[in-house]
Swiss-Prot record:
This is Glycerol-3-phosphate acyltransferase. A motif (HXXXXD motif) lies at residues 325-330. The gene is plsB. Its main location: membrane. Pfam families: Acyltransferase (PF01553), GPAT_C (PF19277). The keyword Transferase applies.
Length: 827
């Protein structure tokens, strides 16, 4: 084989270098690696680069780093060896040519700043591309890697953010010394040099373009990891005060309250002090260490899924708005911790004003929290200041997080969304000048929620305890084994794309000065909010605790033998794996037996042993609390549960009749649990579930009819029980509506709750959400939307009775009698 003189010369030089590595260079790297191995404890992003980025270790891999740093190179080497990736210090031999496995894009700071030796990286890129020209089977994977020691964004001082953070030797020494344990090695998706060579050629101009694109990539990556510079707080306040919207609101405040302009302005500043975050990188670092120590002792693992899609959006310059579900006060800390360890900037977080107590308030402020009141009504100055502050965060490029539910879910299900902050987000777009805003729905799940006992008390009528230092200390003192945590990033929603599709002329409403409320805003915000809730549920996470709770609560006596529980978990797992709820949902890879062992370690269940085997029991006092975890995944199992309930009741039923029954009840289920399917998608989903239930032996399919299989009736009955309480609630409301067609919505909600409470006592229903006000309010609204009830309160008796008769077949006769007798004043 022949190749060019420079390649032969480089090959000879590299061979000499390799043999020389046994001498002084090897000693140099060993000496340098000794302090680095002590000072540097870096983390890899993603956690397991090869499978997460699709790297093929059987094909050649070369690494591209932003600038020349031996400390960075050795830090990269440590992570490569830890993850079974090729050693960057080992040269690549391709067709007899030895090439270094790493390329520095920039030579780093030098004494003579006009000398920037970029030619070396361009030459190496050209050599690699040239080898692809001569060898059509060659495909080198080029992996961009950036190593970061610390991620302080700095404060605004007028200078432009540098595209790369180049440190000289002394600066690098202190960075390693001080920030070695706050360092990250960020692997990016690989670039195929074969594709580059085939599509763009192999000449030197392509190599130059490759180097230029790599520099831009690293600059964007640093901005995504560090974020824009932070403003001085007083400068931010001065800018807000100077805005036309706040200036006008201050004038209105002075006029309406008959106070001086200076006093009104002081009121505005006081509101800014109340609202604004005071972000501190040092507090982030300190909290990261504390949380890292705490999580390792409290949690057995934090499971993160689909983070790469978020990193890519941040890299592409999107303004990220994180919209998680709200389970616990722990959500604030957990999500920021996860984002930080995924190489993303911790967001500014909209926190309830109830958390602004000492010392939590000042700490949360420094971690990025800005505080929001429960209501803006009657305070125009406050709403204007808050809206302008939120708009300023967007215009400066800071990521933001808020809980669209408005508060923590007390039932474990998603709450109906509160749209105020979401509306302000879209209004910020209507000011113009912001980067593309993308909403990121996030499902957060736990195997133990520390507030779950308090939630159950509140649902039964107890007054919510005000957040305070003593309450916080009591909560912390109870923290024990919390099991696993789950953070699943759902399908992002680019707002600009959404508006282009649904409100094509939205740009006509842009006003850079005044906050506008075009006619399309409210319905569009409501639709976006509902879509977000669906996407959050799409990213649901099944785990050992919620699966075991679902099975045990389905049993009449809240107990199953270990064999029965294993059988039931296998039923759930096979349904979720073979007919996935969505591509974003996650199901444990562990076996049913392993999940049961893990759940038993949480000390929520009791085990009775006899000569036959183990009986796993959910104690009565725990049953109410465990409904919370069951409800976390209710949406993932409700459709197969409904099908099982219908088949169990009828013993055998045709597909068409089954489809009719599901079609009648599905709108209520969809609205209550934010289910993902539209009605026209149901036939395919029901067919897939029926086929899976047949595969499991739960039913048989004969002549297009579904028949129960007596040999496997128990798992089918337990599966059906998952829909039992929901169907009972629907039966209550439809019976009341049938008995009194002229009943108004408020009375219907109230009487439905009263009957539900009665049913709960008489029939031992443990779920506190069974008579939750919000659940019945949502149901009645759905009945209005579906035409069962009008705004005037008139119902169509024939239609409501028809639905009630369908529901009456799916509930037990004693429950039906209790419901029907309640309206007649009987016991």
């Amino acid at each position: 084989m022949t190749f060019c003189y420079p390649c032969r010369a480089f090959a000879l030089l590299t061979r000499g270098f390799t043999s020389f590595m046994s001498g002084w260079p090897r000693i140099y790297y060993k000496l340098l690696n000794l302090p680095l191995s002590i000072l540097v404890k870096s983390k890899s992003i993603p956690a397991d680069p090869a499978p997460e980025l699709g790297l093929d270790t059987s094909r050649p891999i070369m690494y591209v780093l932003p600038y020349n740093s031996k400390a960075d190179l050795l830090t990269l080497r440590a992570q490569c060896l830890a993850h079974d990736l090729p050693d960057p210090l080992e040269p690549l031999e391709i067709d007899g040519t030895l090439l270094p496995r790493y390329v520095f894009i920039h030579g780093g700071p030098r004494v003579f700043t006009y000398y920037t030796p970029k030619e070396e990286s361009i030459k190496l890129f050209h050599d690699y591309l040239d080898l692809h020209r001569s060898n059509p089977n060659l495909d080198v994977q080029m992996v961009p890697v950036s190593v970061m020691f610390g991620r302080a964004p700095g404060r605004e001082k007028g200078e432009v953010n540098p595209p790369l953070r180049m440190l000289n030797g002394v600066q690098k020494f202190f960075a390693v010394l001080w920030l070695g344990r706050d360092s990250f090695v960020r692997f990016s998706p690989s670039v195929s040099l074969r594709r580059m060579a085939d599509e763009h050629g192999t000449d030197k101009t392509i190599a130059q373009k490759l180097a230029r694109v790599a520099r831009m990539h690293f600059a964007r990556q640093r901005l995504a990891a560090v974020g824009p510079r932070l403003p001085a707080r007083q400068d931010l306040f001065n800018k807000l005060l100077a805005s036309r919207a706040i200036a006008k609101a201050v004038e209105d405040e002075a006029r309406s309250k008959k106070i001086s302009h200076e006093k009104a302005q002081q009121n505005a500043i006081a509101l800014m002090e109340e609202i604004a975050a005071n972000f501190s990188y040092e507090m982030i670092r300190l909290t990261d260490r504390i949380l890292g120590f705490t999580w390792n002792r409290l949690y057995q693992g934090i499971n993160v899924h689909n983070a790469e899609r978020v990193r890519q959006l941040a890299h592409d310059g999107h303004e990220l708005v994180y919209v998680p579900c709200h389970r616990s006060h722990m959500d604030y800390l957990l999500l920021s911790y996860v984002l930080y360890h995924q190489g993303l900037v911790p967001p500014h977080i909209a926190a309830g004003i109830n958390l602004n107590f000492w010392p939590a308030g000042p700490i949360f402020r420094r971690l990025g929290a800005f505080f929001i009141r429960r209501t803006f009504k009657g305070n125009k100055l406050y709403s204007t200041v808050f809206r302008e502050y939120l708009g300023e965060l967007f215009s400066r490029g800071y990521s933001v997080e808020y809980f669209v539910e408005g508060g923590r879910s007390r039932t474990g299900r998603l709450l109906d969304p509160k749209t105020g902050t979401l509306s302000m987000t879209i209004q910020a777009m209507l000011r113009g000048g912001t980067r593309p805003i993308t909403l990121i729905p996030i499902y957060i799940g736990y195997e133990h929620v520390m507030e779950v006992g308090t939630y159950a008390k509140e649902l039964r009528g107890a007054t919510k305890e005000k957040e305070s230092l003593p309450q916080m200390l009591r909560g912390l003192s109870k923290l024990r084994n919390l099991g696993q945590g789950y953070v699943n990033f759902g399908e992002p929603m680019p707002l600009m794309t959404y508006l282009n599709q649904h409100v094509p002329d939205w740009r006509e409403s842009i006003d850079p000065i005044e906050a506008v409320r075009p006619a399309w805003l409210t319905p569009t915000v409501n639709n976006i909010a509902a879509d977000l809730m669906v996407r959050i549920n799409n990213a649901g996470a099944a785990n050992a605790m919620n699966l075991c709770c679902t099975a045990l609560l389905a049993s009449r006596q809240r107990s199953l033998t270990r064999e029965q529980l294993t059988e039931q978990l296998n039923c759930y797992l096979d349904l979720m794996r073979n007919v996935p709820y969505s591509t974003d949902s996650t199901v444990p890879s562990a076996s049913a037996s392993e999940l049961i062992d893990h759940a038993l370690q949480m000390n929520k269940f009791e085990v009775e042993k006899d000569t036959i085997g183990d009986i796993i029991i959910l104690p009565r006092e725990q049953a109410v609390l465990m409904t919370y975890y069951r409800n976390n995944i209710a949406h993932m199992l409700v459709l197969p549960s409904l099908m099982a309930a219908i088949v169990t009741q009828h013993r055998h039923i045709s597909r068409d009749v089954l489809m009719e029954h599901v079609n009648v009840l599905y709108p209520m289920l969809k609205a209550e649990l934010f289910l993902r399917w539209d009605r026209d998608e149901l036939p395919d989903v029901i067919d897939a579930l029926a086929n899976e239930m047949q595969r499991q032996g739960l039913i048989t399919l004969q002549d297009d009819e579904l028949h129960i299989n007596p040999a496997h009736s128990r798992p089918l009955q337990l599966l059906a029980a998952g829909a039992r309480e929901t169907l009972q609630r629907y039966a209550i409301t439809f019976w009341l509506l049938s008995a009194n067609p002229s009943i108004n919505r408020g009375t219907l909600e109230k009487e439905s709750r009263t009957v539900a409470q009665r049913l709960s006592v008489l029939h031992g229903i443990n779920a506190p959400e069974f008579f939750d006000k919000a659940v019945f309010s949502s149901l009645v609204l759905t009945l209005r939307d579906e035409g069962y009830i009008s705004d005037s309160g008139d119902a169509e008796p024939a239609e409501t009775m028809k639905v009630y008769q369908l529901l009456a077949e799916l509930i037990t006769s004693d429950v039906r009698l209790t419901i029907e007798s309640a309206t007649q004043g009987e016991g």
